Structures are given as C-alpha cells and as structure tokens.
Amino acid sequence: PSSWINREDVEEMEPNKLVSWFLISSYCYYELGRSIMSDLSFDYLVQRLKEHWDEVTHPHKELITQSHLDATTGYDIKFPSIVKMSGNEFLREMIKV
C-alpha cells in the first residue's frame, strides 16, 4: 500500500499521539523515503495538532516548531532514537500484512 494511516485514524488520535505520528511520519518520509500517510492525511494531522497544541504534553513537543506546522513539514528535525525505532517497526509490521 502507498499509505497506511488515514484521515479516520488521525481523527481518533489524542493530542500527544498527533505529536508521535507527526514525528514518525516525517522520519519515514524524509529519512527513509517511505510515505505512511497521504499528503491530505498529514495535512489534516497538522491541522489537528495546531488546534490542540496547548493540550500537548508530549516529551518531544519541543522538537516541533510553529514553522514546521505552518509549512506542514518535519524535514529538518533531528529525530530521537525512539521515533526512528517506532517508524522502522511500523513499516516492518505493515509489510507483514
């Protein structure tokens, strides 16, 4: 499949989960060259993240700047190991399906 996280998945995400998937999706796209959600789903994730930003308590919140959200990109983020591991694990699991 070309993408695995859809708009309905994004709709159900809690604010902290939006941060996780922003980072994981950006890592997969920019570092691995793999898209795990459509551009429209990612744009929707960013929209929801902006709307719920003040509710976010995720420890990696500080990695995401307003300019990342405005440009809907995380291309220059230095991804923590846990994001890399999560992205790689997600891709491995989805390939099995």
Segment roles from a protein language model:
Residues 1-97:
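Phosphate/adenylate-binding "loop-and-lid" substructures adjacent to NTP/NAD/dNTP-binding pockets
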